[in-house]
Amino acid sequence: MTKFVFVTGGVVSSLGKGIAAASLAAILESRGLKVTLLKLDPYINVDPGTMSPFQHGEVFVTEDGAETDLDLGHYERFVSAKMRKSNNFTTGQIYESVIRKERRGEYLGKTVQVIPHITNEIQAFIERGAAASHDGKADVALVEIGGTVGDIESLPFLEAARQMSLRMGRNRCAFVHLTLVPFIASAGELKTKPTQHSVQKLREIGISPTALLCRADRPIPDDERAKISLFANIPQDAVISVWDADSIYKIPQMLNEQGLDRLICEELRLDPKPADLSMWQKLVNAQENPEHEITIGMVGKYVDLTESYKSLIEALRHAGMHTATRVNIEYIDSEELESGHLEVLAPLDAILVPGGFGKRGTEGKIRAIQYARENKVPYLGICLGMQLAVIEFARHVAGMTDANSTEFNLETEHPVVALITEWVDREGKVEQRSAESDLGGTMRLGAQRVPVKEGTKAASIYGAEVNERHRHRYEVNNHYVPTLENAGMVISARTPTENLPEMMELPGSMHPWFVGVQFHPEFTSTPRDGHPLFKAYVEAALAGQQRKGA
């Protein structure tokens, strides 16, 4: 029988509810429990797929092809369970489902209201999401409720959580509330009043937290914890101090040392084995004691908001942990490269162009790719980064000076990258799209197995097959592949059904390490295992650094 831990937030957003939930889940998993996580987003969008990265950050793609909140990426990095579409849902999905039921007459003529119809639907989604993991036998499901207590958008979700707790009875539900304890420099002290008011607001809804996670820029002294305990009406040992850490992988140990997992297990009447966090300690030690150091230039248009590349940044850090390397990331605005300024690329040990959409900044990215190719700097292109590498090669090596993508120029003489109009999805179903199709939910999404060409860099990295996740509408145009191959490019992986290029590379005679992938490998990297492609990329950067030194 699955038990539930609801994780809520107060005072301000962006306190790290996702990291807190994932860290607690990691501790519970280390105690031998089967754990899953869900994220409830209060916005009315059906999913974040069409939301601006500047507003929402990264869109994380699950194995089954769902476009979800970036917190699901944290969940997969901290626990062994794979997230699915059912692990993330929004107000938009809830209302869409209820309205469909009303149109079908399932409510038998009743007036459809927020309570009970919307809140019942939320509960059904939560229980269905929890049942989708571990063959329906998860011991604990942690449910992160997006937004901040007091926001009107979050109220139906909080009410649904309260109703679930009442319906399931004691010891089936626990509540963890994350709040802010700011340090006021002019007063020289931490202020607990925002936390007091946040808990008061939560209790007005009918929810009393089992534990409080108090975020601050420093450890919270015992006297302040005692004060919070008094006003929040919870024991002092349930007031957990969560201070700023230089690595998110230190958080599980921080929470465990203060007994959060013990409190939750006692509340839920669970008696698992003691926590074993030795793996997390080993990862932190590897991160803090590197033997090498490199700098990678990430060339993109969302570089002012690194949340847009959250999984990619973490994947590079994981590769650093597994190669004893400190990976520094230099964020380079691609638009600045369009007018020159290529000198910023000279100190870099490697260059990376991540995924993205739209024409803005693409010519700057192409200039960075040309620099990497001509100066033998290790290069990794992901999704759009592979497409632009093909365009750059077509223009400057294969003689197609007008080469472009139809995403950026419909009139290009050489559309070496074009819209996918038909492909077979991971379940064998034929999908068809056109330029007039809706933007939402119409991309090639999810994991797909693809054979790899023998004797290539791709084969040395992945072996005979690659299984990675996709999120894109455009593909390398097969019509131009023979011309590109005649000029020296190697297409090292193709989809088995449509023969679409999945990986490209340059041979060793042209470049020491130049690889492009149409998929998103960052979505499957974990701190436990790293990722073979990113490890190979970091090793190539180290080799290039040695060549420069020599």
Curated annotation (Swiss-Prot):
InterPro entries: Class_I_gatase-like, CTP_synthase, CTP_synthase_N, GATASE, GATase1_CTP_Synthase, P-loop_NTPase. Pathway: Pyrimidine metabolism; CTP biosynthesis via de novo pathway; CTP from UDP: step 2/2. UTP binds at S13, K191, T192, K193, P194, T195, Q196, K227. PROSITE patterns: GATASE_TYPE_1. One of its GO terms (cellular component) is cytosol. ATP binds at S14, L15, G16, K17, G18, I19, D71. It holds the Pfam family GATase. Mg(2+) binds at D71, E144. Keywords: ATP-binding, Glutamine amidotransferase, Ligase, Magnesium, Metal-binding, Nucleotide-binding, Pyrimidine biosynthesis. L-glutamine binds at G356, L384, G385, M386, Q387, E407, R473. The keyword Iron does not apply. Its EC number is 6.3.4.2. Allosterically activated by GTP, when glutamine is the substrate; GTP has no effect on the reaction when ammonia is the substrate. The allosteric effector GTP functions by stabilizing the protein conformation that binds the tetrahedral intermediate(s) formed during glutamine hydrolysis. Inhibited by the product CTP, via allosteric rather than competitive inhibition. One of its GO terms (biological process) is pyrimidine nucleobase biosynthetic process. Belongs to the CTP synthase family. Homotetramer. This is CTP synthase. It comes from Cupriavidus pinatubonensis (strain JMP 134 / LMG 1197).
